[in-house]
Regions:
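Anaerobic metallocofactor- and corrinoid-dependent redox/one-carbon enzyme cores
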Residues: 1-209
Length: 209
């Protein structure tokens, strides 16, 4: 998700050691893909990305990076490793939208915001707050007015008024924070009310039988 623009992410590291970890993580996954005969820089963007208007791997990575905001990156965490302090952390993990939520929950996340792309919704039986095992509500967000109009029941928040109605980013940010607070206080997410669930996916490196 950062390959092609990893140098920009590294610049946000709190120190040189963390910057090296970020660059090393990107290189690790790129080398791992090459070892299987695939070149991430050549197979991206995928057809679905291009259909949505993305023209290059770098552009795709810049979009992913933009979602992280501008805060300094405190450290790089391994899959399911909990942070040792407050602030923004980079999790060195596979990009699958099916395995990442479980990873972030194991890292200690108690609520998650997911910017919906062009794929279908994904939700996990262990994730909803109504389940007594893992408490981590999952909110789906979009900034695409067309996507929201086609499937309003799938999204918890629509930020498209910034582009369609001239709403300001701070204004929509306040509305999102208010909605986030309501979810954290017990209001159910759209996926919880739909009761839509998929199989839980654990990420494991290497062949799996």
């Amino acid at each position: 998700e950062i390959i092609g623009a990893e140098d920009l992410v590294a610049k946000r590291a709190v120190n040189e050691s963390v910057a090296k970890k970020i660059l090393s993580a990107a290189k690790h996954w790129e080398d791992k893909a090459k070892a299987t005969g695939e070149d991430i820089r050549k197979i991206n963007p995928i057809p679905a990305n291009m259909a949505a208007g993305i023209s290059s791997l770098e552009e795709k990575s810049l979009g992913a990076i933009a979602k992280s905001g501008t805060s300094p990156i405190q450290d790089v965490l391994k899959y399911a490793e909990m942070p040792k302090g407050s602030g923004l952390y980079f999790v060195d993990s596979w990009m699958s939208s099916l395995s990442l939520p479980l990873c972030l929950t194991a890292c200690g996340a108690t609520i998650m915001l997911y910017q919906m792309g062009g794929g279908k919704i994904a939700q996990h039986p262990m994730m909803p707050s109504i389940n007594p095992t893992v408490v981590s509500p999952f909110l789906y967000l979009t900034g695409n007015a067309i996507a929201y109009s086609r499937a309003p029941d799938n999204f918890d928040f629509d930020a498209s008024p910034i582009m369609t109605e001239g709403a300001s980013i701070p204004e929509m940010g306040t509305k999102l924070l208010e909605h986030l607070s309501a979810i954290a206080s017990g209001t159910m997410t759209k996926m919880e009310t739909l009761n839509y669930a998929e199989q839980l996916e654990l990420y494991m490196e290497g062949p799996v039988l």
